[in-house]
Amino acid sequence: MSRIALYPGSFDPVTNGHLDVVRHAVELCDRLVVAIGIHPGKKPLFTTEERLVMVRRVFEPVAEAAGCAFDCTTYDNLTVTAAQQVGASLMIRGLRDGTDLDYEMQIAGMNETMAPGVHTVFLPASVGVRPITATLVRQIAAMGGDVSAFVPPDVAASLKSKFAG
């Protein structure tokens, strides 16, 4: 039986922090499914299709290099339901700090009650990516700042293009 892991997020945009999580996650599973959450109340910078392309372009080579099957999907329901729908027994969550841990522990507890077969795996962020958030990256890019230290090169180019003119 293969071990399937779901890594959910908005990925708006993909950051080096997300990439750090994926590099570790592919070592824990046979198949990694990155799930992009679609939230009706949120207005993302990148369209769903743009985020799907970004996620595939950045994460798929990492999974392939590790011998891990890779998939990308979207979901607009409960994250734990999305995990069940793809057959995941693991849900991957990255942690930057104690605030993340407190929040994620609450969510993990609720998810465990709703889906006892889906186990949350917390991956601590590597030191170099701990301060990175997609929100800060968007703000820096919107103000014309250089985000190349925080996102993969393709993503930096996409952000520059998004805010040009």
UniProtKB/Swiss-Prot annotation:
UniProt pathway annotation: Cofactor biosynthesis; coenzyme A biosynthesis; CoA from (R)-pantothenate: step 4/5
Name of the protein described by the UniProt record: Phosphopantetheine adenylyltransferase
The protein's required cofactors: Mg(2+)
Record function comment: Reversibly transfers an adenylyl group from ATP to 4'-phosphopantetheine, yielding dephospho-CoA (dPCoA) and pyrophosphate.
Keyword S-adenosyl-L-methionine attached: no
One GO cellular component, as annotated: cytoplasm
Record-linked HAMAP family: PPAT_bact (MF_00151)
Record keywords, A-Z: ATP-binding, Coenzyme A biosynthesis, Cytoplasm, Magnesium, Nucleotide-binding, Nucleotidyltransferase, Transferase
Keyword Transmembrane belongs to the record: no
Positions contributing to ATP binding: 10-11, 18, 94-96, 104, 129-135
Transmembrane parts of this sequence: none
Lineage: Bacteria, Pseudomonadati, Pseudomonadota, Alphaproteobacteria, Hyphomicrobiales
EC numbers, comma separated: 2.7.7.3
